Structures are given as structure tokens and as C-alpha cells.
């Protein structure tokens, strides 16, 4: 009796695994998306030089292109790498521009897709962001930003299938990006960029 139950359980697991594998093969393990993303920074910073609560640094909002490459290990689980080119950002102090910098923010996420293969497929993700900061031009060269930032990233989104390969996508991310502003005299301010990224795009599965 025990052998029969064990055999039945093994057969059931094999059938489920075969079904999941067949679905993945049918859709293909790779998904590439191109999105237009609006980046809206949180813009929280310490008062500059301790001069007062009103003297704060802000980073401008921006809409930018984004390339996302996902690999599905199973129909439900996927890893997504998010890429773009270095983005030029404006820095302001109490509304007056004081300089610019460029940032490159690749992000790696692990995703869970709730209804793979369905017409509407929502997902959530979590991972890590690495932001490389370069070409810093602040206060006529007298101030610098830290060259890199590592932080957490959270994601929620949904795919709307057009056919077996093409889909439309809506995606929202919250990313932790932080940096210190330094001068020769010491730290000028600590900035929490921590942006929301809201994107729409198209995906191709193969």
C-alpha cells in the first residue's frame, strides 16, 4: 500500500514537472522588454553644511529608456537584469541649479510571476541596485559625489499578452540610491535619491 501511494505521488510530481517544462518550452525562457520609464526621486537630504532646514539638495525627475532582460528558470520564477545608458542629472539647491552628474544604475531582480501563460500576468520582484556615479560637476568643481551606491530594489508589474511572443507591460519600482556630497572641508550633505520608477513598454518572449 505504501509503495502504491509513493508511486502515485512520484507520478503526480513527474506529471506536474513535465507540464511546467512544456509550458516553459512553448513560451521560451527569455523575455526582453523595452520600456519608457519616468524616474521620480524622493529628494531627501541633510541641510547643506548645517545652514538650515531650507537649504536642501534636489535631483531632477526624468523620463528615460530602459532595456530589461529576463530569464525564466520555471514558469513562475525569473531573474531580470535592468539596463540603461548613463543618465545626466541636474542638482539644485533651494531651486537653483548648482551642477550636474551622470549615473548608470543597473539592477538585478528575482521575480515571481503569479499567473504565467495567462492573458494578464502580474508579478513582484526584489533585488539589488548598483549605481555608478560619474562626470560630477557641482559648485564649479568644488564638490564631489560618492562614486557608487548599492541598495535594495523592489518591483511590481503586470504583463498583458498580445500573442504567444509579444506583450505589453506596466512596471513600478522603488530603488534605494544614496550618496554623500563632499568638499575639501568635509561632508556637505547626505542625499537620499531613492526614486520611484514608473514604466510602460513592450516585451518579446523567445
What are these model-derived regions, one by one?
Residues 44-51, 90-97, 133-142, 180-187:
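Outer-membrane beta-barrel translocator domains and adjoining extracellular loop/strand segments
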Residues 36-40, 68-138, 195-205:
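Gram-negative (and chloroplast) outer-membrane scaffold detector with strong preference
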Residues 4, 26-30, 75-77, 118-122, ...:
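Outer-envelope beta-barrel architecture signal
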Residues 106-108, 125-130, 147-158, 172-174:
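Hydrophobic alpha-helical segments of small multi-pass membrane proteins
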Residues 21-68, 134-135:
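Short glycine/proline- and aromatic-enriched beta-strand/turn motifs that initiate or cap beta-hairpins
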Residues 1-28:
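Cleavable N-terminal export/targeting peptides
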Residues 88-90, 163-206:
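Predominantly the C-terminal beta-signal and adjacent terminal strand-loop region
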Amino acid at each position: 500500500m505504501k509503495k502504491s501511494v509513493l508511486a502515485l505521488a512520484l507520478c503526480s510530481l513527474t506529471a506536474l514537472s513535465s507540464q511546467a517544462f512544456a509550458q516553459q518550452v512553448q513560451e521560451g525562457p527569455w523575455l526582453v522588454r523595452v520600456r519608457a520609464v519616468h524616474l521620480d526621486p524622493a529628494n531627501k537630504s541633510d541641510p547643506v553644511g548645517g545652514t538650515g532646514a531650507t537649504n536642501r539638495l534636489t535631483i531632477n525627475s526624468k523620463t528615460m529608456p530602459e532595456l530589461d532582460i529576463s530569464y525564466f528558470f520555471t514558469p513562475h520564477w525569473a531573474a531580470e537584469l535592468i539596463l540603461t545608458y548613463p543618465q545626466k542629472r541636474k542638482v539644485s539647491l533651494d531651486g537653483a541649479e548648482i551642477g550636474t552628474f551622470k549615473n548608470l544604475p543597473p539592477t538585478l531582480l528575482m521575480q515571481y510571476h503569479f499567473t504565467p501563460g495567462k492573458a494578464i500576468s502580474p508579478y513582484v520582484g526584489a533585488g539589488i541596485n548598483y549605481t555608478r556615479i560619474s562626470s560630477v560637476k557641482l559648485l564649479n568643481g568644488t564638490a564631489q559625489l560618492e562614486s557608487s551606491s548599492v541598495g535594495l530594489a523592489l518591483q511590481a508589474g503586470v504583463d498583458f499578452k498580445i500573442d504567444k511572443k509579444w506583450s505589453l507591460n506596466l512596471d513600478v519600482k522603488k530603488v534605494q540610491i544614496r550618496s554623500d556630497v563632499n568638499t575639501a572641508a568635509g561632508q556637505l550633505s547626505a542625499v537620499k535619491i531613492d526614486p520611484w520608477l514608473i514604466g510602460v513598454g513592450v516585451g518579446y518572449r523567445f
